[in-house]
Amino acid sequence: MRGGPQSALDPGADHAAAVYDLTLLLFIGGGAIFAAVMALSLYAVLARPERFPGARAWVFGGGILFPVVVLTALQVYEFGIARRLTAPTGQDTLRVAVVGYMWWWEVRYPDGVATANEIVIPAGRPVEFTVTTADVIHSFWIPSLAGKIDMIPGHVNRLTLTAHKPGIYRGQCAEYCGAQHTRMAFDVTVLPPDRFADWLAGQERPAAEPADPVLAAGRDAFLKAGCGECHTVRGTPAAGKRGPDLTHVGSRPTLAAGTFPNGVGSLAGWIAGAQHLKPENRMPSFGTLDGETLRAMAAWLESLK
């Protein structure tokens, strides 16, 4: 992937491709104006006065008319792109709601499916993101798929795109939002339509009942520690809404909004030292848990695929 998974120079969706084309055109148009103005400036400085006939015509044509024509053409083209990107969507459009928090992302699909810090969408199908924030201003940006759009308290913005290339793309908050702004990332996975349907069906299922005694002990420890006051795990009594939905947390590639790779070790470290690893986030550290309990809890969470 040219430039990596977070590069606007390698568009993987129609929205990003339009932004890329517009950027190139604006660069070329601006470069043409710059070159013309510099050439005329050099000519005016170096040429003898008698070799500079019709000075007013040169000033009007090169200094006013040429930039106005070029900039007007670029503006008309830009308006056309903006109108196309904001056109109403059809019935086949997948609608995904994203809410920004300090410092993580809540993602909701139709039929009650919820995830966090991970977005999965189908290739070749329009997707409309409705974005807002629960606290401060954030900015939702997936450079390889679309331009950025602000998330404003009390207001819903919309962004529509159609991804063409399956793959994993990285998104990032692009508006400074506090101490952990740089650690507020997310992954966007674009899947073929059949694989997306399988993924969505799997996400709709509640957490499986653990057959392993260690995993069952981890679940019980999770509930006893009060984690269910903030987190939801469908299929258990945990129904909190303050933090990310953890029903299928084990299937996510990263933890803490792209800060760490997912796994038993990372989960245990996060539970024990969330404030040390990501200071000022809203999850307290549970450093008083003994090692056995911590490992069991982390193993159970990792099993939630």
Question: Which ranges hold each PLM region?
Answer:
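Electrostatic cytochrome c docking/interface patches
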Residues: 112-117, 194-223
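Extracytoplasmic electron-transfer domains, predominantly the class I c-type cytochrome c fold
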Residues: 201-213, 237-305
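Short, non-ligating residues that shape and space the ligands of small metal-coordination modules
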Residues: 179, 236-237
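Sequence context surrounding c-type heme c attachment/ligation sites in exported
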Residues: 185, 216-228, 237-245
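Residue-level detector of conserved, well-ordered beta-strand and adjacent loop positions
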Residues: 99, 174, 189, 247-250, ...
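Extracytoplasmic entry segments of secretory-pathway proteins
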Residues: 1-123, 207-208
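The canonical Cys-X-X-Cys-His
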Residues: 173, 218, 224-234, 267, ...
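Membrane-embedded segments
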Residues: 102-106, 115-116, 120-192
